[in-house]
Amino acid sequence: MLHGRLRDILRLLMAAEAPVTSSFFAAQLNVTTRTVRNDIKELQGVLSGHGAFVQSVRGSGYKLRIDDEQVFRTLLQDEFQQKKGLPVLPEERMAYLMKRLLLADHYLKLDELAEELFISKSTLQTDLKEVKKRLLPYRIVMETRPNYGFKLRGDEVQMRYCMAEYIVDERETEIDVLNEKADILPKEEIEIIRSAILKKMKNDRIPLSNMGLNNLIIHIAIACKRIRTENYVSLFPKDMDHILHQKEYQAAEAIVKELESKLSVTFPKDETAYITMHLLGTKRMTQSQCGEDTFSIEEETDQLTLAMIKAVDRELKLGILHDKELKIGLALHMKPAISRNRYGMNLRNPMLAAIKEHYPLAFEAGIIAGIVIKEQTGIEIHENEIGYLALHFGAAIERKKTESPPKRCIIVCASGAGSAQLLREKLRSHFGKRLDILGTAEYYSLDQMSYESIDFVISTIPIKKELPVPVLKVNTILGGTDFTKIESILSDEKEKANRYLKKELVFFQEDLRSKEEVIQFLGQKVVECGFADEEIIDSIFEREDMSPTCFGNLVAIPHPLVPQTKTTFWAVCTLKKPIDWESQRVQFVCLLCVEKENKADLQSMYKLLGSILDDPAAMNQLIKCRSYQELSDVFDQKMLS
């Protein structure tokens, strides 16, 4: 019932807390506002009778209203769980074309492919230019033959890596849904591969993570498919010699023996070595998953891990230097990671986009760790690998939060002792040990109190006096918004944007057409204002080369690879029209500059930025801003909401 673009509009409406304009939808979807209005009219027809409707709010935009949650939920289940048909959005077509070309064992004709997708030849040719860009890192080319059409050519190992990345939907992590989406092998054969791997892993007591197992199944399934069409890998003698001396080679031989008998596929020696490469590069379980006695860490890996943690803690001030679980988790991750790099393997990371969007601080920690790895080993870490490193650092950040001492407060309540007692018990019940309530106080006594041991005041009445600590006004009978206000204090989320914004470095509706133009523009403005040297621009591009800083929701947050400035601040720019920033559309750019030798905890700043990344309505407001004060107010309102 809903084609791809309608699904995306519905997703954006569901995520927005405030009305969203047609221009915001147009920028996100790369269509005109007229197309958006037509789409919303079509969406309205679908939602009619399904418990929801799109409300047009005069002067503000569109908002989703839900009348019957149960009926609406049924619609969502029907729409989002059914198998997708033909692609509609450009990004959907990219994914379709990549799969189509990679799986084709014959030449494809332009006319036939355009007809298959219900698009014009010119649109298809534009799409194929983007396909060629995506094939470039794998050194795969599109070979054209007159009267026949075109097909892909490249090194077999790289072809298989590309297939693993693009044939299987990167969001799918469970192997039982991989087969129906990817069409690599029949389901029964996938099960045979899974059983052969698990049998050997169990016999040899090799601990394997669920994601590691799934990646291994994918690569072996692709190998089977390619061998059947007589496409074989050929490894360098140096690599073969190294692989043959690994204990994993024997495990690969056992798996191959079972597959040959059950799948009627013959694996040459190089193909067995290819499976060994993936066994060497497979993610293993962590210490907590497989027990103390099932792993050992080499001295070299131990030292590298410690250097990574020290660098991250020095740059970001996370207080994670003595986190034993982090050290063990990273060390266990590094050995297969180094093997993956040795053989040019690119581990799929279905969580990468979510990690970058929701855990920007942890991802930055992964970037810093990647720099250390390159400095000490010469290994260039891929973006997917950085995402996995970020997970380890993100877990350490969360563990650190639980170690924080409780916040201390007093209660001011004008309704009497009974109300104060109810309020106190409700707070204790909700926040537990995170909140230490020192007692209650009368309004008139606030001037005589010492606030040295008090972090904030909770009051059921307005307090007009200036107090040296924050005051939170709540209802006597606590509600959801009251808890949210208190949570923001307990989580140290109360951060003001004007602490980082500088009027001379905020620009609106700039007519810039590319990522390079935007970075050059903002970097040059920072230099002209005397906040950094010219080197900052090169450093920003270096960081961008490691991993694009676009996060979806029309946002990009570029920054130097290493801190370059005397203070921590933002340079902000909105654009007249969205631009392509790698794989995302971007219209709001925040150049993040962190102080050299920074000693401050930046977690609250990253939370402030993260709150904007997650909110389409807030981003819509920021893009419409025309003054510094408007921009600052949107940020502050977001933190209060």
UniProtKB/Swiss-Prot annotation:
Activity: how regulated: The regulatory activity of LicR is modulated by phosphorylation and dephosphorylation of the various LicR domains. It becomes activated via phosphoryl group transfer from PEP, EI and HPr on the two conserved histidine residues in the PRD 2 domain, whereas phosphorylation of the EIIA-like domain on His-559 by the PTS EIIB component LicB inactivates LicR.
Enzyme Commission number, as recorded: 2.7.1.-
Residues modified to Phosphocysteine: C413
UniProt keyword list: Activator, Kinase, Phosphoprotein, Repeat, RNA-binding, Transcription, Transcription regulation, Transferase
An annotated GO BP: regulation of DNA-templated transcription
Boundaries of every PRD domain copy: 184-289, 296-403
PROSITE patterns assigned to the protein according to its UniProt record, in alphabetical order: PRD_2, PTS_EIIA_TYPE_2, PTS_EIIB_TYPE_2
Top-level taxonomic group: Bacteria
Residue span(s) of domain PTS EIIB type-2: 407-498
UniProt modified residues of type Phosphohistidine: H219, H278, H333, H392, H559
Record domain PTS EIIA type-2: where: 499-638
Record annotation: effect of changing H278E: Loss of activity
Enzyme class: transferase
Molecular function, one GO term: RNA binding
Stated consequence of mutating H278A: Loss of activity
Homology family: Belongs to the transcriptional antiterminator BglG family.
Function statement: Positive regulator of the licABCH operon.
Name under which the protein is recorded: Probable licABCH operon regulator
Organism (species): Bacillus subtilis (strain 168)
The encoding gene: licR
